[in-house]
Design a protein with these regions (language model features):
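Bacterial N-terminal signal peptides that target proteins for export
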Residues: 2-13
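Bacterial N-terminal signal peptides
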Residues: 12-21
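Extracellular and organelle-lumenal recognition/adhesion modules and their flexible linkers in secreted
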Residues: 23-191
Length: 191
């Protein structure tokens, strides 16, 4: 009986610790979005980051989920206009059933919708993975009005993401970040 009480106390303390460590408060500059955001918890988890004490996180909260959730940040194109940009960041996953990843979208005129978009659906993060660096590269056209970036979880599982950067890149690239050179390079593999 005493052992059962100790196990119950331990379980309660562990649950309290998890609730304290995982704060599903949306961080400044970010917002929660998606087709089924109420089926997920999203926010910040202390002590879970790759390079800092905190990491962004999205976690399914129900067994049956009919859509996705994303943690999103939007900003004006400003200095990125007419440039190629690269979103890079680190993500790890636990028990992701459908897919997860970063996404980058360039919205603009004339339609007001997406001029360019990549959500890694063609190279999804699935299952349980360690910290891995991912990249997305897109062109920001002259008629861009907004850049939207974030992390996405579609279906059951949990993801953590950290150390996200947006960089201007000089080399022409395709949407997956592969450099497209003006001519052949390093054909003898010496560079």
């Amino acid at each position: 009986m005493k052992l059962l009480k100790m196990k119950s106390l331990y379980s309660c303390l562990l649950l309290i610790l998890l609730l304290v460590v995982t704060s599903f408060t949306i961080p400044r500059g970010w917002h929660k979005n998606g087709t089924d955001p109420d089926s997920y918890h999203a926010g910040v988890e202390a002590g879970a980051g790759i390079s800092s004490s905190k990491a962004g996180t999205i976690q399914s909260a129900r067994g049956r989920i009919t859509g996705y959730c994303s943690l999103v940040q939007s900003f004006k194109p400003g200095r990125y206009r007419n440039k190629k940009i690269r979103l890079s960041g680190y993500m790890r996953s636990s028990d992701v059933e459908n897919y997860a990843g970063f996404f980058l979208r360039i919205d603009g005129e004339p339609t007001g919708g997406a001029l360019a978009f990549d959500n890694m659906e063609d190279r999804p993060i699935k299952g349980t993975t360690g910290w891995t660096r991912y990249e997305i590269t897109l062109s920001v056209s002259d008629n861009a009005r907004e850049i939207v970036l974030g992390a996405i979880l579609n279906g059951p599982g949990k993801i953590w993401f950290d150390n996200i950067h947006i960089d201007v890149i000089d080399e022409p690239t395709d949407k997956k970040g592969t450099i497209i050179y003006k001519g052949p390079v390093n054909l003898n593999f010496e560079e």
